[in-house]
Amino acid sequence: MKIKQSEKKVLKAAGHNLKPVITIGMNGLSESLMSEFEKTIDHHELIKIRIRISDKSSRKELIEELCDKSKSQVVSTVGSTAVVFRKNPKSQKKFF
């Protein structure tokens, strides 16, 4: 499911005030981190992630890998922070 530009705008605004709930360190994506990410994104749908890697291209690759593995989508990235969205069909939340 591709996010439309109008939907992305709404999600970006909603994600602005969020605090990062997951921090990815130098070790990258471990099984335990992926498990925690799955639980968190199922519950919240829209989450902010902080990535503690200084290299910009490595951060981008890590975010893409995370989204591919979890079937989620990047809403926005600013520096070392990314906002990620995945719709939970069981959730009652309405973003748009």
Where are these regions (language model features)?
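Positively charged, polar, low-complexity stretches
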Residues: 1-96
